[in-house]
């Protein structure tokens, strides 16, 4: 599919459409949607920003490529003054006091935030069913799950409610729902995009990434968000990806992990489609190498061990003291216990308990360090 960003940009510049009409139309679609993809819409902010874009165009001023382009935000990113709930009871009334670096860069480029998007609570899940706002429905077939945890973001892009959305990927949470909803999702190299302002799940693998209907739009958005950030010590400086780097590739060799695709867990159709894609790559004269990695059956257990350990640590701060839906009890210890047990989802509690177990004395050497 062609770049929607470039198409809309040209329509705005040529005055074929107004930014206000564009934004209002998208907001109407979001508010009327039946896919449970929306946690909250940002009507006032979005229309204020749209009016400013229209004023610039009316005055003959040049607008940037992302200026006036409507986008969605997975509800785990801070955007000052908006609800950031992580689709959880604990933070259902929490308002962001600041804005995430990646989101701020998009705002600085003129993009217009429309919506905070439904997702698995705190990113804990792969179906977008683990949320207080109701399970997200698949954009292709509403009888199926949307994937997760960035399910709402993927559905909104697929249904053209947003031009692009910003999701989060720890262990497939952008790429998997993108695939489920027939769009593109990209997990960048760790550190390419600052994590500042993203609610931490597993900090050593959390990544900020875009979802869109074209690779070109992924490229445009990624370039804007990328870069070293003094607020995130793991962030790195990176080279901008040019349009030519994608359209005129100099890649001569591609590798894939043969043991992954041969796993019994892979659906037959997915395996067939993957191998068909490999043949298309070969047909372009690119050498394809079969690689071996460590056993595929220990991948999931390795991921869960690390992710549960880190999320147990990261979510220990959420006890209702400084923020969140505090539930008072007879004493402080019971207040902490009731606040967390009543406000965390079953899946989140499973991951916290599992994380505390693998980090506890006697288990850390046997499980975590192994």
Could you describe each region identified by the protein language model?
Residues 46, 74, 106, 134, ...:
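Conserved hydrophobic/aromatic pocket- or pore-lining residues that grip, position, or stack substrates
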Residues 19-24, 51-54, 243, 266-292, ...:
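Acyltransferase
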Residues 187-272, 334-338:
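A short helix-breaking turn/cap at a secondary-structure junction
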Residues 1-95, 122-124, 234-237, 243-245, ...:
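Short, well-ordered alpha-helical
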Residues 22-26, 302-303, 348-356:
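Short alpha-helical scaffolding segments that buttress acidic/His motifs in well-ordered protein cores
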């Amino acid at each position: 599919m062609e770049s929607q960003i470039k198409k809309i940009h040209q329509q705005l510049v040529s005055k074929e459409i107004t930014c206000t009409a564009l934004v209002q139309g998208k907001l109407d679609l979001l508010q009327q949607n039946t896919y449970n993809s929306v946690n909250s819409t940002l009507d006032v902010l979005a229309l204020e920003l749209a009016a400013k874009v229209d004023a610039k165009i009316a005055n003959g001023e040049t607008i940037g490529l992302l200026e006036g382009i409507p986008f969605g935000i997975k509800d785990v990113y801070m955007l000052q003054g908006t609800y950031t709930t992580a689709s959880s009871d604990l933070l259902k009334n929490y308002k962001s006091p600041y804005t995430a670096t990646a989101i701020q860069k998009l705002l600085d480029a003129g993009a217009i935030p429309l919506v905070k998007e439904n997702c698995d609570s705190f990113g804990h899940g792969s179906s977008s069913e683990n949320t207080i706002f109701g399970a997200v429905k698949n954009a292709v077939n509403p009888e199926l799950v949307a994937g997760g945890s960035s399910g709402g973001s993927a559905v909104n892009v697929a249904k053209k409610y947003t031009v692009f959305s910003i999701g989060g990927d720890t262990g497939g949470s952008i790429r998997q729902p993108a695939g489920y909803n027939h769009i593109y999702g990209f997990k960048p190299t760790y550190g390419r995009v600052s994590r500042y302002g993203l609610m931490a799940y597993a900090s050593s693998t959390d990544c900020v990434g875009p979802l869109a209907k074209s690779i070109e739009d992924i490229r445009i958005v990624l370039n804007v968000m990328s870069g070293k950030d003094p607020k995130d010590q793991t962030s790195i400086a990176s080279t901008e990806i040019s349009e030519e780097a994608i359209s005129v590739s100099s890649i001569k060799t591609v590798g894939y992990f043969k043991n992954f695709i041969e796993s019994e867990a892979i659906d037959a159709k997915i395996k067939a489609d993957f191998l068909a894609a490999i043949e298309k790559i070969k047909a372009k004269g690119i050498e394809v190498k079969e690689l071996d990695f460590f056993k595929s059956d220990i991948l999931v257990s390795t991921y869960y061990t690390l992710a549960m350990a880190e999320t147990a640590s990261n979510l220990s701060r959420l006890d209702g003291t400084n923020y969140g839906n505090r539930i008072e009890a007879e004493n402080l210890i019971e207040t902490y216990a009731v606040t967390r047990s009543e406000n965390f989802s079953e899946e989140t509690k499973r991951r916290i308990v599992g994380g505390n177990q693998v980090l506890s004395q006697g288990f850390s050497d046997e499980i975590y360090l192994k």
